[in-house]
Amino acid sequence: VEMFNNDHPKAKLTAIYTNEQDAVKMLMEEKIFLAITSRQYTKNEFNTLKNLGYKSMKSAPIAYDGLALIINRSNPDTCITVKDIARILRGEAKKWSDIYPGSKQGDIEVVFDHPKSSTVRYCQDSILGGKPINSPNIQAVEKSAEVINYVESTKNAIGIIGSNWLNDKRDTTNVTFKKNIRVMSVSRMETATPENSYKPYQYYIYDDSYPLIRTIYC
């Protein structure tokens, strides 16, 4: 936003930081004129915009992002499969020992950045195949910084946030500054090992090694 405003001094772009559902809703209500999402618009949404007079409205991919899984530093288990992530979200794995026999971390607490966020939708659509999240211990806060703080202070929690939070060095709340947070490595295989599991770093997103990747649209 700052770069756009500097390059176009006669124009002004004002950013509103909100969840994906509300961003799309504001676009449909003409309260904003640009929304950045992690999904394509639906046919009904395109039709709504066309009926409002936006005949040439388009949605284009502009970037790729990954979902990062973060855990408390006290949790020694840092590799996980996509299959086990789905088991957690379906409520089939309720304790850390259901995935890692012998674990003493207790019940699994799942923390999302917002109940209406694109993170929740991705988990339902891409990990659970369109089915709802049924984990008995779900927490939804208001923003990613609160997810990080929750996981940092809760030994049995697993937080799910956008991987951009791992790389923004300007933001001191991001996990690269948190000594009590671990970033999990994720595997597509049946069993996760350090050799077949990847963290959501830019290169592993670029070469598709990291399993939990989403396209960002504008």
Give, region by region, the residue ranges found by the protein language model:
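Short helix C-cap/helix-to-loop transition motifs enriched in small/turn-promoting residues
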Residues: 35, 41-44
